[in-house]
Structures are given as C-alpha cells and as structure tokens.
A protein has these predicted regions:
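N-terminal glycine-/serine-/threonine-rich phosphate-binding loop
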Residues: 1-61, 65-75
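Proline-centered loop/turn at the N-terminus of a beta-strand
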Residues: 77-79
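Generic beta-sheet signal
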Residues: 81-83
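Catalytic core of DAGKc-family lipid kinases
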Residues: 90-146
Length: 146
C-alpha cells in the first residue's frame, strides 16, 4: 500500500446487514488491528483524521451510501470501491459474492485495477441580494426545482 496505509470500511446504518458484512470482511481478509477503521456513511464527517491516512474506502450499500461517502471523502482524494448491498447499485463495482475473490485486488493495489477519476460539479444557490443560501457538490447531475 502507499503512504496512506489505513483502509476505511463504510456502511449504511439504516441497514444493519451492511455493518455486519463490513466486519465479516475485515475478519475474512485477516487485516491487522490498526490498519482499518469502520464508520457509518452518516457519521463519516467525524472521521477526518482517519481519512487523512486512508488508502482506500470500501463502501457497503447502494448508490445512496456511495454518494454520501463521496461527499465526505472527495476532499481527501480517497479512492472508493462499492459493494452492492442496496436496491440500486449502478455505482458499486462488486457484489457480496465477489468480496473474497476480487476485493483484495483493490485493497492491495493489483496493477490490473485502475482508479477512475470523476469530475464533480458544485452548485451554489444565490438569492437576489447576492447571499449564498446553499452549496452542494454533485457527482452525477444537478436538478433545479421551483
């Protein structure tokens, strides 16, 4: 692994099975204590110290969990690999059946795995008096509603 040596395991706290699968994965991969950390996507914003030293984040859930994770991890430039456990999984790279056979390639930087950098958009809503009311980052698209 690179100078960043920690692996983050992120789950959706609304679905306890995602945390169970994250913990099971840590055990099955035989990761040493101190080389990994676990967080829900909902509390990930409290993990800035851990994210500074993270080489990869493994996200258990659907596209919503992945998008919540990206909002926090993007400023740390942490690559993600998604494990599909939600209803929608277009953004997830792996299924739960592929964890043991393929996830080590991502974690231990197999040369066949390439990181795809994605552009993000930032939208800011400014009121008529030029005050910024809201700012949001987006990976996929922006939508205006009246």
């Amino acid at each position: 692994m690179s100078k960043n040596t920690s692996i983050g395991f992120i789950y959706n706290r609304q679905f306890p099975e995602t945390k169970d699968k994250a913990v099971e994965t840590i055990t099955r991969l035989g990761l040493k204590s101190g080389t990994w950390w676990v967080s829900s996507a909902e509390t990930l914003h409290t993990k800035s110290e851990e994210l500074k030293n993270t080489s990869i984040a493994v996200v258990f859930g659907g596209d919503g969990t992945i998008l919540r994770t990206i909002r926090v991890t993007s400023s740390f430039e942490v690559p993600l690999v998604g494990i599909k456990m939600g209803k929608i999984g277009f953004m997830a790279e792996l299924t739960t059946d592929e964890i043991e056979s393929r996830l080590p390639d991502y974690i231990f930087k197999d040369k066949r795995i390439r990181v795809e950098k994605r552009m993000m958009l930032k939208a800011e809503i400014i009121s008529p008096d030029s005050v910024s009311n809201n700012s949001n980052a987006s990976l996929q698209s922006l939508m205006q509603s009246s």
